[in-house]
Amino acid sequence: MGLPEVMPASVLRGQLLLFVLLLLGPQISQGLVITPPGPEFVLNISSTFVLTCSSSAPVMWEQMSQVPWQEAAMNQDGTFSSVLTLTNVTGGDTGEYFCVYNNSLGPELSERKRIYIFVPDPTMGFLPMDSEDLFIFVTDVTETTIPCRVTDPQLEVTLHEKKVDIPLHVPYDHQRGFIGTFEDKTYICKTTIGDREVDSDTYYVYSLQVSSINVSVNAVQTVVRQGESITIRCIVMGNDVVNFQWTYPRMKSGRLVEPVTDYLFGVPSRIGSILHIPTAELSDSGTYTCNVSVSVNDHGDEKAINVTVIENGYVRLLETLEDVQIAELHRSRTLQVVFEAYPTPSVLWFKDNRTLGDSSAGELVLSTRNVSETRYVSELTLVRVKVSEAGYYTMRAFHADDQVQLSFKLQVNVPVRVLELSESHPANGEQILRCRGRGMPQPNVTWSTCRDLKRCPRKLSPTPLGNSSKEESQLETNVTFWEEDQEYEVVSTLRLRHVDQPLSVRCMLQNSMGRDSQEVTVVPHSLPFKVVVISAILALVVLTVISLIILIMLWQRKPRYEIRWKVIESVSSDGHEYIYVDPVQLPYDSTWELPRDQLVLGRTLGSGAFGQVVEATAHGLSHSQATMKVAVKMLKSTARSSEKQALMSELKIMSHLGPHLNVVNLLGACTKGGPIYIITEYCRYGDLVDYLHRNKHTFLQRHSNKHCPPSTELYSNALPVGLSLPSHLNLTGESDGGYMDMSKDESVDYVPMLDMKGHIKYADIESSSYMAPYDNYVPSAPERTYRATLINDSPVLSYTDLVGFSYQVANGMEFLASKNCVHRDLAARNVLICEGKLVKICDFGLARDIMRDSNYISKGSTFLPLKWMAPESIFNSLYTTLSDVWSFGILLWEIFTLGGTPYPELPMNDQFYNAIKRGYRMAQPAHASDEIYEIMQKCWEEKFETRPPFSQLVLLLERLLGEGYKKKYQQVDEEFLRSDHPAILRSQARLPGLHSLRSPLDTSSVLYTAVQPNETDNDYIIPLPDPKPDAADEGLLEGSPSLASSTLNEVNTSSTISCDSPLELQEEPQAEPEAQLEQPQDSGCPGPLAEAEDSFL
């Protein structure tokens, strides 16, 4: 006997409701009835009022979602009623009352009726509100209600902003309040009871941005093992107030999980709900649903996600690979294995049972990436596959719960290549051809022949060769697989029994990677060796031609002689375009000619790559002296025509320059009947660098006392004022002395001039040695006849001498700058020392082997003195008188280091160039005063426009000298200008007003301004008629009086203007010498150089 089945209470309630509806269905249709009827009632305070609600079904009264005390009954006629008695009513009883069906009958009966009751209460103007009802949230732009309700419907109510006392015109309903569209502000309601004004509570209106619900649900892991945690996030974007409701498997068993709400403020804002189960069970597998709804409206959305709880982890292959994988040689190959696993596995790759890892050279790359939650892709990438990488590979993925592995063989296909094709000639007359090649996969061998294999494909196919039934050929092929190299080797041997004419035979190997072939020509044994002989002859001819080409190129790259100095004729208005005097077109004044029979050549003073300087004795140059020792510039017999033209250009320029005390002056020239000779002054003590080296010990002994700094020494002349020296300041006397520290060319053979014209004389001139001490010099008898003032005849090198050398060089450079002359090689090696410590500026590049001189760096067809060059000259090929100022600063450094080499700490490479670009400057020399070093620094200004001109440098150095030295220098200069020096006499013949040209201490006439091209500038070159040259040198002396200057091209500027003497100004009338003094001389051009040699950087 079974027990009765127990039914749930909800089922019994539903059956009861169905039974009541079936019985009372017709009566329910009559609806709810309220007694007394009416939409609203106004009750007196403290009165009693009874309300009855009746219907065919059980009913009840509600007020503000609350159920007041009431009396329910079932009438005799079968209807139901509920009586609500309001006793001793007050203003607080004002409000809505609803008659509804009893909730126990279910939601099917949702009808209700409403009645509103007012209880006017003088003490209560407005009904009290709960605090949460004072905050009114508005979504979008919709109407809303401010519920300031009164107890008396007869009262007049107004609405105000709290901060403004002006009433708002908004409709008012006594039962509901003010209805309208409101801004986000604070509002208050006002009414008047009797003579008393009553204010309501303050209402706050807020607008909420409620966008469409966009829900996203994600889980940290959708697959978890039992015992691990489950975390699911439900996120809503852009909504401020939402409600979350979760549905998940545990709810069926009544085990609830409390979600956690997470607010992430930002733009846009995010609100999230997190459902966390710390310990997952197998029963937690299933669907997790997140339902989101907006609090202020009925919008909503929901999303679901499936979570799987497993007992143990797993690893499963999703794709398999073929057992043999193919890779091509020297091409990258990626091998990919796809599998699924949880938790994350470890992955290893093996080759031939050896573990693989990433190659440091990047030739092998291993990677495993997670493409989804449980899906993985592991890749093996071989970069530029090699033959050695062929073999057996295995991928193994594993973790503590499971593992899986996949193996395959990698075959590297190698293109076929013919390694060897040889022939042999056995004694039996056969021709044996052996072809050996390799490849992977196995290559096939094909032999073919033709009279000319290159033409065969055009007309007919080559004839295949193989085993012949006529026994004309026999073929044998052997195939071997090399395990180490993982490729096949094929050796094929072809025997040709009868070859009576030349044949071209091809061996071709082919596989899936391509083909390769070689050809060989098979000739009969009787073929002559004519081809071999012809080939050898052709090879010798080709080698001879190549050797000649190389020799010609080396000859053309040999550096050419060029004069360094340039004379600027005019500058463009913007300072970036220059026009230089073209020395080729200048005329030559024949008054400088000296007959060759009046010149006796002596020993070589200096020899260079292009020419030499020879000591000589000249007759008839001076009225006061029968003979004069001079220096003669000449080219070597191997000089090219361009170098002869450069020397002639130098002579033409020098013939138009005026004399100066501190410049090596031109005395004469020989241009007819033989080589070109330029005759200049002779300086017995050589160049300044060597002079400083020879006399350094006297300076150091003099200044060994540290308490007596050089800058404090007092200058005094050791000789009395009346002591004289030979005419022309003994510059041309027959005295001993050295010349320049240059390489002596003792092997120079002089071509006797008598062989050419029969007029030149040679003599053994007394040898001079500048190694002799300064004080050992004893003037000869003729020299003692004429004595003049000496600047200094002391044998000891003093600090004043160093400053005096600097001062004299600055005076000479000031003179050159006033003639718009740019030196471009100002250095101590180009400054000579004469008697009385007089210095003269020169350019003896002709007599210096610059190709072996470390001070000159080769660039194309020229050599450049980089250590003395300004930055704009090094990097931009810009040469101006202000770039000479930079070189003057380097010369000062040489003087006060007693002949030191500039930049001793910098090698001549990129380090030197980078240091100059960064603004590196040499340190103060040990023997230089602060004033001298300050002058150096001014000369080394980065911007050449800010460097001082030579006129200013003369004044700066003059301040450092004593009055005695300046008087002696001025006296020597005046005596020089009044003497019968050949340079003075010949210049006076052309320019009568020479003595009034310049005072040695007057520097105001030199102005460093741009020379504007005008007719006056062009007029200073006087087109004098040239002497008729001999046929041998006719081309060098040609110079037409066309334009006095031209913009120089590369050919014209290859020889710069030598400033052994400065350029002379145009002759002016004898009656106006003072006007010439007042006219300022332009000093050069600070703008960029428009031409000249290319920058060597």
From Swiss-Prot:
CDD domains: Ig (cd00096). One of its GO terms (cellular component) is cell surface. Gene3D superfamilies: Immunoglobulins, Phosphorylase Kinase, domain 1, Transferase(Phosphotransferase) domain 1. Residues 1016-1097 are annotated as: Disordered. The chain crosses the membrane at residues 532-552. Residues 32-531 are extracellular. One of its GO terms (biological process) is regulation of actin cytoskeleton organization. It catalyses: L-tyrosyl-[protein] + ATP = O-phospho-L-tyrosyl-[protein] + ADP + H(+). Residues 1072-1081 have a biased composition (Low complexity). Its EC number is 2.7.10.1. Residues 32-119, 128-209, 213-308, 415-523 form the Ig-like C2-type domain. Residues 1042-1059 have a biased composition (Polar residues). Coiled coil: none annotated. The active site is at residue 825. ATP binds at residues 605-613, 633. It is found in: Cell membrane; Cytoplasmic vesicle; Lysosome lumen. Disulfide bonds join 53-99, 148-189, 234-290, 435-507. Residues 599-961 form the Protein kinase domain. Residues 1-31 form the signal peptide. The modification Phosphotyrosine is found at residues 561, 578, 580, 685, 715, 739, 750, 762, 770, 774, 777, 856, 933, 969, 1008, 1020. Interacts with homodimeric PDGFB and PDGFD, and with heterodimers formed by PDGFA and PDGFB. May also interact with homodimeric PDGFC. Monomer in the absence of bound ligand. Interaction with homodimeric PDGFB, heterodimers formed by PDGFA and PDGFB or homodimeric PDGFD, leads to receptor dimerization, where both PDGFRA homodimers and heterodimers with PDGFRB are observed. Interacts with SH2B2/APS. Interacts directly (tyrosine phosphorylated) with SHB. Interacts (tyrosine phosphorylated) with PIK3R1 and RASA1. Interacts (tyrosine phosphorylated) with CBL. Belongs to the protein kinase superfamily. Tyr protein kinase family. CSF-1/PDGF receptor subfamily. Tyrosine-protein kinase that acts as a cell-surface receptor for homodimeric PDGFB and PDGFD and for heterodimers formed by PDGFA and PDGFB, and plays an essential role in the regulation of embryonic development, cell proliferation, survival, differentiation, chemotaxis and migration. Plays an essential role in blood vessel development by promoting proliferation, migration and recruitment of pericytes and smooth muscle cells to endothelial cells. Plays a role in the migration of vascular smooth muscle cells and the formation of neointima at vascular injury sites. This is Platelet-derived growth factor receptor beta. The lineage of its organism: Eukaryota, Metazoa, Chordata, Craniata, Vertebrata.
